[in-house]
């Protein structure tokens, strides 16, 4: 949903196709996890997400995903950076693609424009009991923060029949300024949502960041749940309600309440440096239960390491 993201995505597609690489191009703005999910579904070599995540609106960026759907290792991204500094394939790496450049490039027979969101929703439906949740008489307010998570929750629960649940989305339209804030699920960015939670009596509030790979939450009345609280609740649910066991992985700036809960539930604990890229390798191991970071990224057993 950032300014000119479609143009950047098209340029990346052109360059990959010009190097005889098959490309699936999303037909709409999509969450970063949708790219990761599609990579795994298709057995792709990797993927690219055009996003600047939770950063200010003036920025855009280039996320690289590997064949497992996780963020590329630092060795890979550093190699790409060095290559850009030393190479200039097709004469396009130092300037924007113009109409003349497009005319010089070969056709794109290896490019398929398709939905990445639809198969992502199907993966989410397999990962959780969406039909059971959809039957619950819950009012949920979803703050999309003008990002690529817009519409996702509504579509997801429509797959479950949506018999009792009511999903209301706010800030779900495209605004390349993100309403004047950084699209990050922090309390000071969602005061308008806190007011609605209280006045309209919602049972739960969910907040996505700009590319919908991180989450925040609110309880009835509008009290903001920190990512620290969310991690503790997720771990409690997995160990107490589902009775799962396994390794608990956290970045070192996550609350020590996770340490204490891991101890009393008999789960081994691993603490990593900041950044989900340090957590993702543990998620590839069958004995890992959950991994999470302070900025709101979480992943659990049986899901993509993202």
Annotate each predicted stretch with a short phrase.
Residues 1-59, 155-218:
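N-terminal small/polar loop signature for handling phosphorylated ligands or for N-terminal nucleophile
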Residues 13, 17, 36, 81, ...:
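Predominant activation on well-ordered alpha-helical scaffold segments within soluble catalytic domains
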Residues 17-22, 132-140, 239-246, 263-265:
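Short, surface-exposed connector motifs at secondary-structure boundaries
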Residues 27, 82-120, 219-299:
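Proline/glycine-rich low-complexity loops and linkers
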Residues 30-33, 55-58, 71-72, 79-80, ...:
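Short gly/pro/ser/thr-enriched loop/turn and capping motifs at secondary-structure boundaries
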Residues 44-59, 197-220, 224, 267-306:
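Glycine-rich phosphate-binding loop
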Residues 46, 139-141, 249:
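Conserved beta-strand elements of the Class I
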Residues 60-200:
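Gly/Ser/Thr-enriched, mixed-charge loops and adjacent short helices
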């Amino acid at each position: 949903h950032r300014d000119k993201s479609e143009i950047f995505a098209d340029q990346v597609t052109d360059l990959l196709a010009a190097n005889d690489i098959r490309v699936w191009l999303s037909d709409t703005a999509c969450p970063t996890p949708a790219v990761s999910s599609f990579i795994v579904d298709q057995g792709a070599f990797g993927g690219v997400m055009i996003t600047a995540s939770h950063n200010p609106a003036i920025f855009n960026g280039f996320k690289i995903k590997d064949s497992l759907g996780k963020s590329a290792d630092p060795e890979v991204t550093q190699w790409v950076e060095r290559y850009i500094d030393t190479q200039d394939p097709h004469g396009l790496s130092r300037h924007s693609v113009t109409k003349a450049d497009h005319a010089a490039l070969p056709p794109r027979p290896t490019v398929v424009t398709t939905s990445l969101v639809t198969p992502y929703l199907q993966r989410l439906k397999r990962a959780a009991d969406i039909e059971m949740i959809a039957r619950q008489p819950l009012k949920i307010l979803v703050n999309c923060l003008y990002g690529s998570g817009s519409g996702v929750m509504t579509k997801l629960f429509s797959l479950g029949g949506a018999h009792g649940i009511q999903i209301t989305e706010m800030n779900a339209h495209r605004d390349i300024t993100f309403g004047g804030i950084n699209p990050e699920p922090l309390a000071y960015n969602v005061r308008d949502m806190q007011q609605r939670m209280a006045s309209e009596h919602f049972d739960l509030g969910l907040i996505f960041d700009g590319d919908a790979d991180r989450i925040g939450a609110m309880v009835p009345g509008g009290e903001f749940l920190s990512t620290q609280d969310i991690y503790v609740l997720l771990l409690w649910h997995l160990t107490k309600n589902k009775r799962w066991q396994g390794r608990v992985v956290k970045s070192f700036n996550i609350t020590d309440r996770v340490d204490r809960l891991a101890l009393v539930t008999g789960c081994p604990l691993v603490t990593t440096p900041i950044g989900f890229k340090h957590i993702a390798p543990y998620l590839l191991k069958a004995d890992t239960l959950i991994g999470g970071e302070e900025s709101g990224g979480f992943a659990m057993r049986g899901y993509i390491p993202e």
